[in-house]
Regions:
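Peripheral terminal and linker regions in Fe-S/redox and tRNA-modifying enzymes
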Residues: 1-267
Length: 267
């Protein structure tokens, strides 16, 4: 259903509390909201959410089409006279990396000196919001000071790539994901630039096990962990997220990934 713009936060809270009260949080494999919807049925789930919105009018769902899953990285107008800056965060890790981006220090300094709010995106990037035009130079200076990369210099593939956390955090993981994908993307970048595809948004996702928390099954290239340093390769999804990929190879060794994907990119 749809709600008016001013009721969006209330609707989101109703959805979250419905999942909290009706979802199975004791069994991790059955904890996600999609299983709650499957168990209750979409009509019952919708009715429960609406019940939690007393006095708020809801409207029939409209047809909605997403053309991309890409975040609007970089600087953009917010629509109210202010700006927002969407910052690429490698694998979603807000940490200070040795000899690399100091994400944590940058965001801490921005919060302390400019008191700006943050929004975390589904692609695990960070949007710095409510920036006054006169603050733009200060934000740029702080990001540059802490070596936070500018998205303009990245391939379109790197901008949209995503991995689940996997090892060592997740006990279900069979192989690396978050810690492996940056290196895989380096290899992709080399091939993409060689073939002139650096501006084509080719969706690459990696997950540490078949549960697929990294959403590999609708990516152009999805790598699904099977065993240490071994992945199943799924090919043929889309940047719009509206097409499932198919299993191409049951096992690809980590060191063979670049050689395996090159023929697909050359085709």
């Amino acid at each position: 259903f749809y709600v008016k713009r001013e009721n969006v936060v209330d609707a989101a809270e109703a959805i979250v509390t419905t999942q909290r009260d009706h979802g199975n949080r004791t069994e991790r494999k059955n904890a996600r909201m999609k299983y709650t919807v499957q168990t209750m049925g979409i009509d019952a789930f919708r009715a429960e959410v609406q019940r939690r919105l007393p006095g708020i009018e809801t409207f029939p769902a409209k047809e909605l089409k997403f053309d991309t899953v890409e975040d609007h990285l970089g600087w953009h107008e917010q629509g109210d006279g202010k700006l927002y800056c969407a910052v690429y965060v490698s694998m979603g890790r807000i940490v200070d990396k040795e000899n690399g981006p100091q994400y944590r220090s940058a965001f801490a300094e921005l919060a302390c000196t400019l008191d700006l709010p943050y929004i975390i995106t589904p692609n695990t990037n960070v949007i710095i919001a409510d920036i006054a035009p006169e603050q733009k130079d200060a934000v740029d200076a702080i990001l540059a000071k802490h070596q936070v990369p500018h998205a303009d210099g990245m391939t379109a593939t790197r901008r949209v790539a995503h991995a689940c956390v996997a090892l060592p955090t997740c006990g279900l993981s069979l192989s690396e994901s978050e810690r492996a994908l940056p290196g895989v993307l380096d290899e992709f970048d080399t091939i993409l630039r060689e073939l002139g595809l650096e501006n084509d948004p080719i969706l690459v996702r990696m997950t540490g096990c078949p549960n697929g928390c990294g959403r590999p099954y609708n990516a152009d290239f999805g790598f699904v962990g099977r065993a240490p340093n071994k992945y199943a390769l799924f090919v043929g999804g889309s940047i719009a997220g509206d097409r499932l990929a198919g299993l191409e190879q049951k096992v690809v060794i980590r060191g063979d990934i670049s050689a395996t994907v090159r023929p697909y990119l050359e085709a």
